[in-house]
């Protein structure tokens, strides 16, 4: 930790190895993953110098070395540290992801600066520093208009980077499934009750049940048996309810579903990733507790891909409706538009340097 602080105050000479690279700053793991679809494309065209702020991000980013050439903590926000960092690395440009308004970084560096996935809050620091960026790509046109009143010049809207699909290969299974992902204790009963009702009409339908915490798989399996369901564990597909007791495959399971249900939304958790199933053209249902994913919820409802239900009765009604009529989900198309817009603006700017 002391060494990390020293590197922030007195950036390392080894930065000279990354001279002329494109400097990308993603403060945390969340910002890195949000920007990753764009970073993958930029890495094909530029050497990348990646900086981070969160100490937790360092260990995670070490496992993602395919996407950068040099990794260094963000210099401390004082004139000496940021100037030394720039002097050693001589970057081609700086891309700042989201709302990293560090005054010394933005004021005392001479490198061309780009702000991406930005949104307007109207804070004083935002009003002062936004005009220091040479290119700003924002989430909405309303954000653009607000930043223009602050004196920002080259400002565009491309949408929210969080809405870009990041799909895996997907798993192929025979049968008809509802996939319930990231389910917490306290909401599993709601889903099992609704599924029991749906099975009266759709007897061949199966439920793939993925707990948020894998250690709950056996508890959920017992609850399913208590409801009278035949159960099995993935990859055995003989049960009416198939429990998943392994990490990291939920994203790959969504494409087998006719419908997805995302957890953390029927209890007061705030929701998990609502986007993943819709990237495969699968409609997603969620409960009323979505305060952590409101931006995704609003986007999906606008695209006709997301559906909120308040209780078990509404869940049965919505499942019946979506099972009876094939719904066309075009989220991936919208995702490609957003990604294409960001890449077009960034490439155009970088070509001009």
Swiss-Prot record:
Keywords: Cell inner membrane, Cell membrane, Lipopolysaccharide biosynthesis, Membrane, Transferase. Pfam families: Glycos_transf_N. It catalyses: lipid IVA (E. coli) + CMP-3-deoxy-beta-D-manno-octulosonate = alpha-Kdo-(2->6)-lipid IVA (E. coli) + CMP + H(+). The keyword Amino-acid biosynthesis does not apply. CMP binds at residues 211-212, 247-249, 273-276. GO terms for molecular function: Kdo transferase activity; transferase activity. It is found in: Cell inner membrane. Its EC number is 2.4.99.12. It comes from the Bacteria. Transmembrane segments: none annotated. GO terms for cellular component: plasma membrane. Highly thermostable. Does not lose activity after 16 hours at 70 or 80 degrees Celsius, but incubation of the enzyme at 90 and 99 degrees Celsius for 1 hour results in gradual loss of activity. Its main location: membrane. One of its GO terms (biological process) is lipid A biosynthetic process. The record marks 98, 162 as: Transition state stabilizer. It is a peripheral membrane protein. Pathway: Bacterial outer membrane biogenesis; LPS core biosynthesis. Involved in lipopolysaccharide (LPS) biosynthesis. Catalyzes the transfer of a single 3-deoxy-D-manno-octulosonate (Kdo) residue from CMP-Kdo to lipid IV(A), the tetraacyldisaccharide-1,4'-bisphosphate precursor of lipid A. Is strictly monofunctional, i.e. is capable of adding only a single Kdo residue to the acceptor lipid. Belongs to the glycosyltransferase group 1 family. Glycosyltransferase 30 subfamily. This is 3-deoxy-D-manno-octulosonic acid transferase. It comes from Aquifex aeolicus (strain VF5). The lineage of its organism: Bacteria, Pseudomonadati, Aquificota, Aquificia, Aquificales. The gene is kdtA.
